[in-house]
């Protein structure tokens, strides 16, 4: 089941279990020599349980078996509205982010705002603004029969989950 049993954003147990199982598969490929310095690993979320094993393995492996690692930074400790602030996770998460910044090849963000946030927080690795992880045309294809903007009823739609992190009271 994909229901959130523990937590407010993703199920803490389910997310951790899935991430760790994926990392287990990656570690096996690294051990087998299937992953080399020509490979690139991309994580859609900087906080991925198990990620911390990569620098441990790569620092002890020959350079030809050290893949490039990129990941997406979604908000985390630089966003005062992020759920982890509310849940009291700031201190250990900031240290986790600093650990990640020590070994990744680069960090992807959605906008220039996040570049400023990360630099202010002391991040050193290259940061790339990649925009949103989906294309405008793909989104438009999912909504049939759209009207020109001037012909639409003026109303606000709240498309996020109903969590304080997304500030639903603003609407």
What does each model-found stretch correspond to?
Residues 11, 46-50, 75-78, 113-115, ...:
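Short, solvent-exposed loop/turn segments at secondary-structure junctions
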Residues 49, 70-87:
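A short, histidine- and acid-enriched strand-loop-helix "catalytic/donor-clamping" loop
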Residues 145-169:
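Conserved donor-binding/catalytic core segment of Leloir-type glycosyltransferases
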Residues 39-42, 68-70, 106, 155:
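Structural motif
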Residues 1-56, 60, 64-65:
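N-terminal pre-catalytic "stem/leader" segment of glycosyltransferase-like enzymes
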Residues 51-57, 81-84, 117-121, 140-141, ...:
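A short acidic (Asp/Glu
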């Amino acid at each position: 089941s994909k229901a959130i049993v523990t937590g407010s954003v993703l199920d803490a147990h389910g997310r951790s279990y899935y991430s760790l199982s994926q990392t287990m598969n990656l570690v096996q490929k690294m051990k087998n020599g299937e992953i080399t310095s020509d490979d690139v690993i991309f994580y859609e979320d900087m906080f991925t349980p198990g990620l911390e094993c990569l620098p441990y393995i790569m620092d002890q492996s020959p350079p030809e078996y050290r893949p490039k690692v990129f990941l997406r930074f979604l908000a985390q400790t630089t966003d005062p509205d992020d759920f982890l602030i509310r849940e009291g996770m700031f201190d250990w998460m900031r240290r986790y982010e600093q650990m990640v910044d020590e070994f990744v090849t680069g960090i992807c963000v959605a906008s220039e705002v996040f570049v400023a946030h990360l630099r202010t927080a002391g991040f050193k690795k290259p940061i790339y603004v990649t925009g949103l992880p989906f294309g405008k045309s793909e989104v438009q294809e999912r909504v049939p029969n759209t009207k020109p903007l001037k012909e639409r009823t003026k109303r606000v739609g709240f498309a996020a989950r109903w969590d304080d992190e997304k500030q639903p009271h603003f609407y």
